[in-house]
């Protein structure tokens, strides 16, 4: 079995030699799914996992735009259409200088499993550009988004591929993208999710990834007769996911003591309460400032430049920033400091060494493909509402989100429970996500 796993990983490395993030994501899945395939004959034909690791389509394109000084700038755009076995491609757009083929393929591959776990009919995809919205004027962002959509509109559609936001793509960018699609195609359809409420967006969509992550952590804690109430929580990031994860933690009686951005992290031992969180939301969403400004408003807090928050003592850790932000040494520090639960809000924020240590330590650890699936689940609910030309209330959407996260947790427990009763959520999420897609691929033939 070990040889089969290694042979598969070697094949992936050979075909994708300059794509470390993609290789990392596929390796993590292969280590748990290949042993499952070996025990289940129906999945041994047709090279299912190998086909899942090969995108159905990759589109790469030039994005020229003009800045405010009249200079022409050129960026590179992408759309990875990974797998459509269970529904139209679904996955976010990321605008960040680090964006490349490896990162987007890893995100698209993860998205296939994540979307499968939601039980909604959505395939997996991802896209973006190496454009940095930071420091750009609204008009510059608009011109970039319009140029980006000129090419993207060729490959998306309400029943083909429905993108959403991700890092660097929030409500402003989605609005510009949607507006230009409408102008180019002369049609008002649900080709993007994360839209504003006034033009087809869903209530709870902005909150969904953060809320869903906390709901998943809540479910894990219940398996050990624990609650969020009274727990100290360390959160990384200060964007959409981190903000609403913090909001839900506060609603459930937890104490949030850190948030961060690419410059460093703030530690507020007194706790980030509702008023302080409101300040952070305004700072990040409206003023587009840096988290370091928090300590100017609240001097009792400390700012740690160039550092990550994992040395801060806590009961629960929610990594909500970006991939590979939590390494093996930091995982050891968290566990030795008494952390009992880690629930990933970002995509693959823990390195393989960190994941291995969490699982070996038998703490509660949720991989992002399960714990942050609330965002895409609510995107799926937005697609449903767009199709019906109807809107559900906040309570209805939140109840559906809560139910979906409960179902994902249940699926992880079903496939991840070990002989000693310990739940390996990594194994559970990978196998549960694989089974639905594999069944659909087997039914549809070699395509």
Where are these regions (language model features)?
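Rossmann-like adenosine-cofactor binding region
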Residues: 264-365, 370
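Glycine-rich phosphate/diphosphate-binding loop of Rossmann-like nucleotide-binding domains
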Residues: 193-196, 201-313
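Structured beta-strand/loop patches that form or line metal/cofactor-binding pockets in enzymes
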Residues: 42-73
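Glycine/serine-rich phosphate-binding loop and adjoining beta1-alpha1 elements at the start
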Residues: 96, 115-229
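Adenosine-phosphate binding glycine-rich loop
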Residues: 2-26, 220, 335-447
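Phosphate-interaction motifs
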Residues: 61-122, 126, 130
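Flexible, glycine/charged-enriched surface loops at secondary-structure junctions
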Residues: 20-23, 41-46, 119, 156-165, ...
